[in-house]
């Protein structure tokens, strides 16, 4: 993909992710016993994904129009975490591809910050999945 296509794809994905994390934060705060921590984490992720949209807009010279698609919130925490694990890993790959395709060092630095946040999201999601699986084994 060329840089414009990568930016558009990432813009669409980040827009979807920001919305999805926000909806799931609300859902899991109500649905889960002691879901406050997951809700706070997902709310933070939603805000960070929204900040990635601003970075993409700065690189593109203006925010592309997002092609919104409705992604249903996870029916369970495990389902949501597995979906986010895949989405975050794909975002990291796409951001690395975009960075490699750009020449402007300032844009590469901006993307490094985004990639670092995406990696942090992925690590957190994997920790939650590991803890969830361990709690199921103990039950």
Feature-to-residue mapping (PLM):
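Non-heme di-metal
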Residues: 1-139
């Amino acid at each position: 993909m060329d840089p414009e296509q990568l930016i558009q794809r990432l813009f669409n994905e980040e827009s979807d992710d920001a919305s999805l994390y926000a909806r799931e934060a609300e859902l899991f705060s109500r649905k889960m016993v002691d879901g406050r921590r997951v809700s706070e984490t997902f709310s933070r992720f939603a805000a960070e994904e929204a900040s990635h949209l601003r970075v993409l807009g700065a690189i593109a010279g203006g925010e592309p129009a997002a092609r919104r698609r409705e992604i249903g919130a996870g029916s369970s925490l495990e389902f949501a975490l597995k979906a986010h694990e895949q989405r975050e890993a794909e975002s990291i790959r796409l951001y690395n591809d975009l960075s490699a395709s750009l020449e402007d060092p300032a844009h590469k630095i901006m993307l490094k910050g985004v990639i670092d946040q995406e990696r942090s999201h992925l690590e957190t999601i994997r920790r939650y999945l590991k803890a969830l699986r361990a709690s199921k084994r103990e039950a």
